[in-house]
């Protein structure tokens, strides 16, 4: 699956910003057909970072949300700044 089709948009909520600052996690809405491996590959390729783990859930609205934890040597704040979240 094309990395640019896997990630639909970042989530910008109070909880998502808190996760960026406290747990080094990014939150994205992703394609519902994307697997955790697809999401990991897409984030690593697009943002040039290494991913530690990916957790996913289907929201009540029917969207797939992915919580992506980056390895400690990479900063979620820097990626968020590149995305324009800060």
UniProtKB/Swiss-Prot annotation:
Statement: the UniProt record of this protein carries the keyword Ribosomal protein: yes
The GO biological-process annotations, alphabetized, read as: translation
**SUPFAM superfamilies to which the protein is assigned, alphabetical:** Ribosomal proteins S24e, L23 and L15e (SSF54189)
Keyword list, A-Z = Ribonucleoprotein, Ribosomal protein, RNA-binding, rRNA-binding
A molecular function (GO) held by this record is: rRNA binding
What GO CC annotations are associated with the protein?
ribonucleoprotein complex; ribosome
- Family per record: Belongs to the universal ribosomal protein uL23 family.
Function summary: Binds to 23S rRNA. One of the proteins that surrounds the polypeptide exit tunnel on the outside of the ribosome.
> PANTHER family, per this entry?
60S RIBOSOMAL PROTEIN L23A
Q: How does it assemble?
A: Part of the 50S ribosomal subunit. Contacts protein L29.
Matching NCBIfam families: PRK14548.1 (NF011118), uL23_arch (TIGR03636)
Would you tell me the protein name for this molecule?
Answer: Large ribosomal subunit protein uL23
**Which gene does this sequence derive from?**
rpl23
């Amino acid at each position: 699956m094309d990395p640019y089709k896997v990630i639909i948009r970042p989530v910008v909520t109070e909880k998502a910003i808190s996760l960026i600052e406290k747990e080094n996690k990014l939150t994205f809405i992703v394609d519902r057909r994307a697997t955790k491996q697809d999401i990991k590959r897409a984030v690593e390729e697009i943002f040039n970072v290494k991913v530690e783990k990916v957790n996913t859930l289907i929201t009540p609205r029917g969207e797939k949300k992915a919580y992506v934890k980056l390895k400690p040597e990479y900063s979620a704040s820097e990626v968020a700044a590149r995305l324009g979240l800060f």
